[in-house]
């Protein structure tokens, strides 16, 4: 929802924020100041902020950077549910494992677009070597 012209949150606005915080497991920390949160908690809070806007397109910059393994797993599951519900999710990330799970389409960029398409077609040893300048063992296509 959008706030009224006085910018006073309505009950529906508060409900949307509460639901967004619940989705990222931050509701118990809702009364904390942002400076009191860890890096991973801030990432989840920023994701909740994006969810509260109820947009169908999400643009996320390094969403998995600085979060623990359990938080990353929970975020991936949430993003997959959003994707399956019809949301478009654009992710800028160096975490190839996480994005290969979440993303259907990949663009590899190193000063220019080197490869794009379905994850299985793009994540080849040749493309990854061209992108990162070295072989990346363990990243499977």
Which residues does each predicted region cover?
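A short, surface-exposed alpha-helical micro-motif characterized by mixed small hydrophobic
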Residues: 99-101
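Conserved ABC ATPase "signature" region
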Residues: 11-29
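Helix N-cap at the start of a conserved alpha-helix in ABC-type nucleotide-binding domains
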Residues: 69-71
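Conserved switch/coupling elements of ABC/ABC-like ATPase nucleotide-binding domains
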Residues: 111-121
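H-loop/switch region of ABC-family ATPase nucleotide-binding domains
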Residues: 93-94
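Catalytic Walker B motif of ABC-type/P-loop ATPase nucleotide-binding domains
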Residues: 58-61
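Conserved ABC ATPase signature
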Residues: 33-37
